[in-house]
Every structure is written in C-alpha cells, then in structure tokens.
Swiss-Prot record:
The protein's role, per its UniProt record: Tropomyosin, in association with the troponin complex, plays a central role in the calcium dependent regulation of muscle contraction. May also regulate motor systems required to maintain nuclear integrity and apico-basal polarity during embryogenesis.
Record bears the keyword Cytoplasm: no
Domain of life: Eukaryota
Similarity remark: Belongs to the tropomyosin family.
Natural source organism: Drosophila melanogaster (Fruit fly)
Protein name: Tropomyosin-2
Sequence segments annotated as region (Disordered): 82-110
Amino acid sequence: MDAIKKKMQAMKLEKDNAIDKADTCENQAKDANSRADKLNEEVRDLEKKFVQVEIDLVTAKEQLEKANTELEEKEKLLTATESEVATQNRKVQQIEEDLEKSEERSTTAQQKLLEATQSADENNRMCKVLENRSQQDEERMDQLTNQLKEARMLAEDADTKSDEVSRKLAFVEDELEVAEDRVRSGESKIMELEEELKVVGNSLKSLEVSEEKANQRVEEFKREMKTLSIKLKEAEQRAEHAEKQVKRLQKEVDRLEDRLFNEKEKYKAICDDLDQTFAELTGY
C-alpha cells in the first residue's frame, strides 16, 4: 500500500511537472507566435516602405527628366538669343560704316567748296589788277579789255562752277542732312539695341541662375537617389534578415509545438496511468 502511495505521489509529481512544462511550452509558443507576428508586421511595414521608396525613386527620376528637358529648352533659347545678338551687332557695324562714308563725302565736298572760293577770290584780285593797269596805261587798254573779258569769262566760268559747286554743296548738304538723320536714327537704333542687349544680358543672367539652380536640383536628385538606393539596400537587408529571423522563429515554434505535443502525450499517458491505478485501487 505504501508502495502504491509512493507511486501515486511520484506520478502526481510527474503530472505536476508535466503540467508546468506544458504551461511553459505554451507560454514559449505564445511568445514565439507574438514575436513572429511582430516580425511579420515589421516585414509588412518594410514592404510598404520599400514600395514608397520605389515610388519616390520614380518621382525623382521624372523630376530629373523634367529638369533636363527644361535645361535643353533654355539652352536652345540661349543659342537663339546669341544668334539675334550677333545679327544686331552686324547691323550696328553696317550703320557705323555708312556713317563713316557719309562723313568722308561731306569732307570732300567742303574741300571742293574751299577750292572754288579760293579760285573766285583769285579771279576778283586779277580783275582789280587789270582795272588798275587800264587807268595807268591806256595803250594797253585793249589788251587789258581783252584780258578783262577773258577774266570775266573766267569769272563767269568760275561763277558757273561756283553755282555748280553750290548745287553740289546743296546736294551734299541734303546728303549730309540725310546722313545726320541716319546717324540720329542709328543712334536711336543703337540705344534700342543697347536696351535689347541689357534685356538679353538680364535674360542670360537669369538663364545662368536657372541653369545653376537646375544643376543644384540635379545634384540634389542624385544625392537623393543615392540616399534612396542606400535606404532601399538597407530595407532589403532588413527584410532579408527579418525573413531569416521569421524562418528561425517558425522553426522554434514548430519545435516548441512538437515538444508541447510530446508533453501533452506524456501528460495523457500519466493521466491514463493514474486512471488505471485508481481503477485498480478501487477494484482492489
């Protein structure tokens, strides 16, 4: 009877130990399942972050392509502006050449007028000399008269030439006035061109600033893409690590479930032994 009691106590102790082990295994299984759920949640979060990173990367690429397109358009505009500036410079150079030619023609006309005036003065002086000589020497009157006629003819010729020179001078003055008008128009055009050049210069400065900003944005996009690539790589590594950890915990859960199943089987066997023992004692 004492042996049976000892056996029952031993079986009860073994039963209690089995129950404790089963509870421990269940708690460990719950903890493992909780950690597995937490890791699965982290994996889902990482997958969401990974998707967001891919979206951000696509957006960054689109913005980079847009910046490149804007930069190309600005470069085309800059080329067209430089071509327009070169055309305006050629026009200014042509106006300056026309002005120089007008000044040369004006100088030539003034020189011819001076020569004609000097010739007329010389003829008048000769006439005075001939008149004085006619008073002093009557014998030479005819000669002087002829000379006077010749002088008058020369004077008339000089007057004719003077009239022609005057007409030419008037024509030259008209040309000079036209040239001055062209000069004034050219100066006005030059002022307009200077204003246009200022506007073009400001546009060029604005384009340079825009290009610098575009380059800065490109560099920022590159740095951001590099950062996103690093984050993506880190996320992939974390996801891979999490998957490995999930697999390891799943194996641990499977092992604990197997252990729990074995403990339950042992507990069931002990209960069966106890029931059988009680049945034997009762039957005894």
